[in-house]
Amino acid sequence: MPILNLTPDELLSTTRSVRKRLDLTRPVEPELVRECLELALQAPTGSNTQSWQFVVVTDPEKRMAISELYRQSWTAYRATPQRAARTYTDPTERRQTMKRVIDSSEYLAEHLHEVPVHLIPCITGRLDHLSTTIMQAGAWGSILPAVWSFMLAARSRGLGTTWTTLHLAYEREAADVLGIPYDKITQCALIPVAYTLGTNFSPAPREPLDSVLHWDKW
């Protein structure tokens, strides 16, 4: 797959959360996943610990098992009052956007097992005991840049991704499916990876910068 002709600004502004436009019928070459992960390893990591691990899941039975855990969590999340409140009480424009997000999330939950590659980024050690903000920030700051780098590399190669965490409600069960040593490794997310249906993605609507910008003081 040739690299898409995107400027750095275009790459950063058009790497979207892709759900409905994932090509569920086209295999993803293992070497392409490796290329993206090689680039991900260049991301910064706290104290250069490089405490990341990446589990790539392509086996259909294991993808189905992980997807069933994801669907159980999605069903529970969909029924929460907080989710309903966000859907129905936001201003009209945001409500419409939220409906599209929920619809695409529903689609992903139904079809996750068909996505050819599941990437599960992990951190060495358990994060459950991290009680201070500085420790939590350090841990997540050592994996999120790498995953975002992976997503950017994937986008530039015609692949779509999205950050999901719902399967973590059943992290131990997922660890059993994949042979991950639960007591020593923390799963951080599940990234579906597939070719996209078309490569024409646009910048997303966002609130004006000045509504969230604080300069020198709040």
Model segments located where?
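Short loop-to-beta-strand entry elements in the cores of soluble alpha/beta enzymes
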Residues: 47-58
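Glycine-rich, charged/polar anion/phosphate-binding loops
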Residues: 39-41, 102-106, 174-178, 198-199
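A glycine-rich helix N-cap at a beta->alpha junction
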Residues: 75-88, 177-202
